[in-house]
Amino acid sequence: MVDPATGAHTTSTSQMATAAARQALERAGVQADEIDLIVLSTASPDYLLPVAATYVQQQLGLEDCAVIEVRAGCVGAVQAHDIARRLLADGTYTTALVIGAEAVSPLLAPVFLGRDPERVRMRDRLTVYTFGDGAALVLRAGEEGSAHGRPRPVFATRSLGGARKPGMLIVGGGTDAPLAEQQRRPRLMDIRLDIPGTAQFGPRVFVEGIHDLLTRSRLALADLDACVLPEGNAEYFASEYAAAGLSPADQATLSKTIVENLTDVGATGSAAVPLALDAGWREGRIRPGDTVLLLAIEASRYLYAGLTLTWDAPFPGH
């Protein structure tokens, strides 16, 4: 995390993830040594190797723990959630931290630090003003589903952008070119957004995801108590629902259930869904027994990942 005023690098992805983990453990009254699985999603790890999840393990003081890292943006936290859910359900592990964490500011700092804001290109301003750093997680324990008389969770994920250029491309640090060649580029790291493409195609990805999850889970929109979709009420997004195939009646039903906090935290990649979920829970919009849909849309290759579940965490402080 980079301080936008001073340019000082203050916090890494794993440090943010660990801070969120400690907060969750304290809320739940769980000791760190009870954790036997960490599943972390990020597109901005501390290093290529070791994976950031192992640094969370280290910072929590866990000598021995299973770790899995999902390399993804917005969809990663939902994918990580399903991985952990399955491993807990079959008894492989007992208690898991499912983390989404993203530190985007170190990638964006060269765009604006020490520069006159008026001389920053408009497309770069959109990137700087849109993204944020963050980390959030779900602490999961035990088996769920039919053993408790509830519907089993349903998961689905797809990439709809196999024949399209990426809606988001983060360049640098990969193997597309030798490092010496990468260092000759104007920026070692760069985020490139296809703003028109994402505005036009993004809502279609969302609508496809909604229909897919409802079909697989045999639920109707009216059955959902909450739809955690970080960008669901964004004007540029919601204005395209009709063109993407969502009826006005379904739009009205959906808008009453959407839980998001984009205007509060910005676009936070892997952290977006768990941050919105946490906000909805703390605000009382998500209550024990609610049927919840977690749905993430990622512009990189126009992916979605969704998971239906029954929320059973008590209100904060209870």
Features from the language model and the residues they span:
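Flexible, glycine-rich active-site loops centered on histidine and acidic residues
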Residues: 89-131
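Glycine/charged-rich beta-loop-alpha catalytic/anionic-binding loops adjacent to active sites
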Residues: 34-39, 58-71, 116-123, 252-261
